[in-house]
């Protein structure tokens, strides 16, 4: 027997150390991981056999067998699925989730409950075996191949791969050499109970080999859970299916089990998690909704089964209308799949709308977890934007709580027709922004946008149900006229501009190219000034994001709005009327302050510091 001793990847030792020291609070979950892997192996071969029937010749009835061997201190899990050759064993068991390993380690929090969720999600579930075993032996023969290989490790930095002369049929056998202190797992009653707990939803028959009777007892119903009537399924069975499918420790927040009959027939069993998934915004994230055709697993990768913005969904979709022999490539642009996707999207958004109305506190928690992903759909051309906006909620500056756009509209002041928002990184900073002080003083609400995606979707959704969605940074906002006619507004604007022309001209003269224009503000009530942009210009935060991403080179010049009721601005104006133009440094300081409040860079930080020091010195001397 030729043996090769190999070292695990560098990070594998860290993972194994976590397994050995019981990262899982519930050690028996190792059985869930191994049964799930065995079921996946059978599903993969079942799919391949549709086009390569010879792979299952003589053994087409898939099964999983669990055996407790007290005499040898072993628990053995055997399947007749796809199996592995030498290369597969090294790739799948010698490394951990390839690209996911570093992310797994990076995401460890030290909180055992949270870290439990990461194990399966990053593909390290097999290694949970080392929580109960001091040695693991894997024997496998790949479908369509003759050679048998053995992988063996004690979980201490290295493993051995060897070929074997053992008579062994297709599939994989995992023998766990149980630690002395964990020998309760060898008890047949406990072992059967554990297997039954984690297997009832598995579509592959699972047998327990009873040494005493020397026969096999089937422990599960071996029918896909989603094919059963909802009345036959307990809440616990739904929960266990979700946890096994998602490698999760939380319970699902929403369970959607539906049979769609008519032009397109399919069944969906979908879950919305109650906790945020670690990889929601990770570029290498995996899809967690599996496609089945007539109970045969097809794929959960590279298929457009659900829109990207609903990627937090977990579950299965089983189609009756797609042909079993369809290639994965043909699924990319398939009419039936597109109709299934549209039906699921409509169903999920309908469920979310109901939850938003019936359970607002629960919905707030859901939104904190997944709202950022959901809003990405507002940037996609194929989305029904109005339906999606109906389930969106945002922070209200006036009421300091999450509200929907429909609730915002219900709170319109008489004559108001515009939805106002302000975007930024921090809701507390936004609340103190000069941009919204005037609106709030008139009890006109402002929605606070703090997700990066907000700056994108508002560019393609300029209105909702006939009401404009407008940034509070726009120059044309007049809080006194926000609920009045545009004709009245234009008259008052002209009067203000004429009255303070000497003031705005003076600021333009001092600031030069640093500003695009200087105007009298119709939205400031206490602050001296603020930056603003014209109706056609890019929002300030959006521009800053594009500069950070090197999509544009430089920031554009902004409008500076002045508050003539502010004491500082009033002093400058009175000085001008007295023919005193000695406030250049103060003008520059006001502009610098406005830039800082908007997160814009100050043109000359040294000069800004000197101006500030000079003014402080004058004040105290």
UniProtKB/Swiss-Prot annotation:
InterPro entries assigned: HATPase_C_sf (IPR036890), Heat_shock_protein_90_CS (IPR019805), HSP90_C (IPR037196), Hsp90_fam (IPR001404), Hsp90_N (IPR020575), Ribosomal_Su5_D2-typ_SF (IPR020568)
Is GTP-binding one of the keywords?
Answer: no
Q: Where in the cell is it found?
A: Cytoplasm
Keyword ATP-binding included in the entry's annotation: yes
Keywords of the record, alphabetical order, are: ATP-binding, Chaperone, Cytoplasm, Nucleotide-binding, Stress response
Q: Where is this region: A?
A: 1-328
Q: Which SUPFAM superfamilies match?
A: ATPase domain of HSP90 chaperone/DNA topoisomerase II/histidine kinase, HSP90 C-terminal domain, Ribosomal protein S5 domain 2-like
Question: Care to name a GO molecular-function term for this sequence?
Answer: unfolded protein binding
In this chain, composition skew of type Basic and acidic residues spans 486-498
Q: Which domain of life is it from?
A: Bacteria
| GO cellular component assignments | cytoplasm
Which SMART domains would you find in this protein's record?
HATPase_c (SM00387)
Ranges for the region named C are 545-621
Q: Where do the segments described as B lie? A: 329-544
Report any Pfam family annotated for this entry: HATPase_c_3
Region of interest (Disordered), ranges: 479-498
Which coarse location class applies to the principal site listed for this UniProt protein? Answer: cytoplasm
Protein family (similarity comment): Belongs to the heat shock protein 90 family.
Protein purpose: Molecular chaperone. Has ATPase activity.
**How the protein assembles, per its UniProt entry?**
Homodimer.
Name of this chain's protein: Chaperone protein HtpG
From what organism does this protein derive?
A: Rickettsia bellii (strain OSU 85-389)
Identify the gene encoding this protein. Answer: htpG
């Amino acid at each position: 027997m030729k043996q090769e001793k190999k070292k695990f990847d560098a990070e594998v030792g860290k993972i194994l150390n976590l397994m050995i020291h019981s990262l899982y609070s519930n050690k028996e979950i190792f059985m869930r991981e191994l049964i799930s892997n065995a079921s996946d192996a059978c599903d993969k071969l079942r799919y391949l056999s549709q086009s390569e029937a010879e792979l299952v010749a003589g053994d087409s009835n898939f099964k999983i067998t669990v055996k407790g061997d007290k005499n040898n201190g072993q628990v053995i899990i055997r399947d007749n699925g796809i199996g592995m050759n030498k290369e597969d064993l090294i790739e799948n068991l010698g490394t951990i989730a390839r690209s996911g390993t570093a992310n797994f380690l990076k995401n460890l929090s030290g909180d055992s409950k949270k870290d439990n969720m990461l194990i399966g999600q990053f593909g390290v579930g097999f290694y949970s075996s080392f929580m109960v075993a001091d040695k693991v032996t894997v024997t496998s023969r790949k479908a369509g191949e003759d050679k048998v290989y053995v992988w063996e490790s004690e979980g201490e930095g290295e493993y051995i791969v060897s070929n074997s002369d053992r008579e062994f049929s297709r599939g994989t056998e995992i023998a766990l050499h149980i630690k002395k202190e964990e020998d309760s797992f060898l008890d047949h009653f406990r072992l059967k109970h554990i297997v039954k707990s984690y297997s009832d939803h598995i579509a592959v028959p699972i047998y327990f080999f009873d040494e005493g009777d020397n026969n096999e007892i089937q422990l599960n119903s071996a029918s896909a859970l989603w094919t059963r009537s909802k009345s036959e399924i307990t809440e616990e069975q739904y929960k266990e299916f979700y946890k096994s499918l998602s490698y999760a420790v939380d319970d699902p927040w929403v369970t959607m089990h539906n049979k769609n009959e008519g032009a397109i027939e399919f069944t969906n069993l979908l879950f919305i998690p109650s906790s945020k998934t670690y990889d929601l915004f990770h570029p290498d994230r995996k899809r967690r909704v599996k496609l089945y055709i007539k109970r045969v697993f097809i794929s959960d990768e590279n298929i457009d089964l659900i829109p990207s913005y609903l990627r937090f969904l977990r579950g299965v979709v089983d189609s009756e209308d797609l042909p079993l022999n369809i290639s994965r490539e043909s699924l990319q642009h398939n009419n039936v799949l597109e109709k299934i996707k549209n039906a699921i999207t409509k169903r999920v958004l309908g469920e979310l709308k109901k939850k938003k109305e019936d359970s607002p506190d629960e919905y707030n928690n859901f939104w904190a977890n997944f709202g950022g992903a959901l809003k990405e759909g507002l940037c996609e051309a194929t989305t029904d934007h109005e339906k999606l906006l109906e389930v969106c909620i945002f922070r209200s500056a006036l009421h300091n709580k999450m509200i929907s756009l429909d609730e915002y509209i219900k709170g319109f002041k008489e004559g108001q027709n515009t939805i106002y928002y302000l975007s930024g990184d921090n809701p507390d900073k936004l609340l103190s922004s000069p941009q919204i002080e005037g609106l709030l003083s008139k009890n006109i609400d402002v929605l606070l946008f703090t997700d990066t995606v907000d700056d994108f979707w508002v560019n393609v959704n300029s209105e909702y149900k006939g009401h404009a969605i407008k940034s509070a940074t726009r120059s044309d906002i007049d809080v006194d006229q926000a609920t009045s006619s545009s004709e009245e507004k234009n008259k008052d604007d002209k009067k203000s501009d004429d009255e303070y022309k000497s003031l705005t001209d003076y600021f333009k003269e001092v600031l030069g190219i640093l500003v695009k224009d200087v105007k009298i503000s119709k939205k400031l009530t206490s602050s001296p000034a603020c930056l603003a942009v014209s109706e056609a210009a890019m929002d300030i935060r959006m521009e800053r994001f594009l500069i950070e991403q090197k999509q544009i080179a430089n920031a554009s010049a902004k409008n500076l709005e002045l508050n003539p009721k502010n004491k500082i601005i009033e002093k400058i104006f009175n000085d001008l009327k007295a023919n005193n133009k000695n406030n250049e440094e103060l003008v520059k300081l006001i502009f610098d302050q406005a830039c800082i409040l908007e997160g814009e860079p100050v043109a000359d930080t040294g000069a800004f510091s000197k101006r500030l020091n000079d003014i402080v010195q004058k004040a105290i001397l």
